[in-house]
């Protein structure tokens, strides 16, 4: 698929067919995430891949409030592949303490924004685009802060890794487009400023 077609087709899909993601496609999705840019080539990310039915149930039990059901979550739960993208701040602080960077005190205030989260988001976007390129559907969703401890406990995730979000991936089923799409995309005239605000 041409890159512009991938970009145009990319949307958040919230319902999936009961069909597994082929292993070679899954591995390509992960491999492309590893190609994401990262400050200082820190690569401060990790990815938790969840495919087994029992593991997926454990995931949903950990990240949702008991008894919480909604039309969108029912469709997401059918995704045969879940990839949690986690950022690792310490990898950046350590990398930038090295001689070629020179931030030896590892101060977080050096960073104008948390690039460990930004770069993990880049990796997640590459996974979304790779899924579309392979003819799959995907959705990026966050884990609510009050559910993070349960998620960590369920999967043994170390405290040094923060879940930036997770992707549900699979073959899309007919789903109801989000009402938010009615807002339309903002135009370049609204958001692009050339040489001055």
What are these regions (language model features)?
Residues 69, 73-82, 155-178:
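A glycine-rich helix N-cap at a beta->alpha junction
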Residues 33, 39-42:
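N-terminal structural module
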Residues 15, 46, 137-141:
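Short catalytic-loop micro-motif centered on adjacent basic/acidic residues
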Residues 87, 143, 171:
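Short secondary-structure boundary segments
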Residues 32-34, 83, 103-153:
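Small-aliphatic-rich amphipathic alpha-helix that forms the alpha element of a beta-alpha
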Residues 13-28:
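A short N-terminal beta-strand-loop micro-motif at the entrance of redox/enzyme domains
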Residues 42-120:
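Glycine/small-residue-rich phosphate/adenosyl-binding loop
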Residues 3-13, 164-197:
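C-terminal helix-cap and adjacent tail motif
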């Amino acid at each position: 698929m041409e890159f512009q077609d991938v970009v145009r087709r990319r949307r958040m899909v919230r319902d999936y067919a009961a069909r597994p993601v082929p292993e070679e496609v899954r591995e390509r999705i992960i491999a492309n995430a590893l190609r994401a840019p990262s400050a200082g080539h820190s690569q401060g990310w990790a990815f938790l891949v969840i495919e087994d039915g029992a593991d997926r149930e454990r995931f949903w039990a950990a990240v949702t409030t008991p008894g919480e059901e909604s039309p969108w979550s029912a469709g997401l739960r059918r995704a045969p592949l879940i990839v949690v993208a986690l950022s690792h701040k310490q990898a950046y602080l350590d990398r930038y303490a090295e001689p070629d960077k020179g931030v030896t005190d590892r101060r977080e205030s050096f960073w104008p924004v948390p690039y460990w989260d930004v770069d993990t988001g880049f990796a997640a976007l590459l996974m979304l685009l790779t899924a579309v390129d392979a003819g799959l559907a995907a959705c990026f969703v966050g884990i609510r802060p009050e559910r993070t401890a349960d998620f960590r406990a369920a999967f043994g995730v170390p405290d040094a890794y923060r879940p930036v979000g997770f992707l549900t991936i699979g073959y899309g089923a007919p789903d109801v487009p989000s009402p938010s799409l009615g807002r339309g995309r903002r135009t370049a005239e609204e958001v692009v400023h050339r040489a001055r605000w």
